[in-house]
């Protein structure tokens, strides 16, 4: 009988331990950090608001192009397939000049390429278009626009075309292009 008493006490202990493990205590989430940013805009300045993103692209054995227009519409030619939900968007810039001021805008004329992160494969960017009325193709030569807002604040999108090679190597591609403004 002593053995059955010990088994009963042991079994009660196991049941009690199981019940205690099943009781949940309030969970306390650890603190999380986030970032805060501000841009102080001075007269005769401008800054990048958004990056140019071409989104997700599936290459094939045939070369093709992907264009993101200044209005955000994405189109393709040739042997590429576009996936939705890739975050595609034109680059956006904003700044401040004076009302009715003329501004010269140009694009650095060096070859503009995206290079595969961790690799050497490239894709070429071309036909940069500023979202104005009418739209203007950006080159190394100055193009001009007028600041129409009475506050002098302006913004504009820039789209471009990406050349995707046949059987382009998969991966993330990144690069830069430089837009220059000269206030007249």
Model regions and ranges:
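N-terminal secretory signal peptides that target proteins for export/translocation
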Residues: 1-7
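N-terminal small/polar-rich segments of proteins
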Residues: 28-115, 144-184
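Bacterial Sec-dependent signal peptides at the C-terminal "C-region" and cleavage site
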Residues: 22-28
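Bacterial N-terminal signal peptides
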Residues: 11-22
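Hydrophobic alpha-helical transmembrane segments of integral membrane proteins
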Residues: 10-11, 154
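Terminal beta-strand-rich extracellular "head" domains
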Residues: 104, 113-141
């Amino acid at each position: 009988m002593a053995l059955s008493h010990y088994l009963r006490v042991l079994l009660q202990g196991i049941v009690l331990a199981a019940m205690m493990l099943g009781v949940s205590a309030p969970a306390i989430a650890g603190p999380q950090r986030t970032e805060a940013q501000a841009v102080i805009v001075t007269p005769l300045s401008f800054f990048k608001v958004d990056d140019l993103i071409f989104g997700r692209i599936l290459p094939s054995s045939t070369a093709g192009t992907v264009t993101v227009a200044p209005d955000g519409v994405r189109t393709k030619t040739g042997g590429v397939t576009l996936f939705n939900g890739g975050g595609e968007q034109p680059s956006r810039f904003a700044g401040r000049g004076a009302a009715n001021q003329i501004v010269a805008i140009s694009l650095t004329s060096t070859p503009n390429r995206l290079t595969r992160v961790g690799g050497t494969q490239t894709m070429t960017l071309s036909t940069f278009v500023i979202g104005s009325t009418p739209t203007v193709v950006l080159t190394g030569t100055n193009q001009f626009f007028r600041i129409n807002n009475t506050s002098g604040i302006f913004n504009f999108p820039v789209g471009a075309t990406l050349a995707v090679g046949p059987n382009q190597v998969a991966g993330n591609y990144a690069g830069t292009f430089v837009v220059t403004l000269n206030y007249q």
